[in-house]
């Protein structure tokens, strides 16, 4: 028996739907809007539907990242998912792990202390990321990622529970130079950094290597990127630092640390292989030592302040303790 392509007509498929975007979905990306309409559909299927032109906005083709406006007409094609109620959900143990990682929640948002190795969202061979798992935990709620963290970075990941909170938080994220959301990271850098604050103001450009892998480098044609590094403690010839960033570019801290000549410990992409090997053998560091430790912002036009913190992951605390 051959597998059914869910984008092809078959059996008792639902018909084409024309959906008018409501006011509370204005500003939402097309792919996220479709994920809400096609419950249980994997993100890869949504992208396939968009790329193939089966999804239309106001009668025309659109890109997955298009921001919708209130009143837009979205054509949602008939989709046949697996007979067993779409697809299997996230494993129970993984769901419990993420539920225990929630460090803050109110009526508008929740904050997750995302473990290293967990993607912010699924796709590209990843069945379940943090957002898919949280949606499985809270099937009656509308949850949307406010931002993303690299898969190997641990720490604060913010999820909006209301459309109004998502819009306000994303507007704050667009305000560079710390005007919107103040972000603080903890990291271990290779080598001995000098005292004081070291500011890296170096534009970053995202390129693609063979095979489609993203690679970021300092380049004059890139986007403005500013990071401030400060040594908290020196251990074993290396520097435990806090980093405050004014911009939120892809791999920003990792590439700026490399640019300083003090790459992030455990960084397989931008780091020093010899240092990584030595730290793996000496202190058992098997992951990227980069942690999103705190976020500060205010909602309601500055009237409701939030100060969110995520404790350093146990494996990083233990690695630091072994580093003498």
Segments predicted by a language model, with ranges:
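RNA pseudouridine synthases
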Residues: 1-210, 305, 311-323
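Short coil-to-beta-strand transition motifs
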Residues: 93-97, 218-227, 289-290
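Conserved hydrophobic positions within beta-strands
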Residues: 102, 189, 228-231, 264
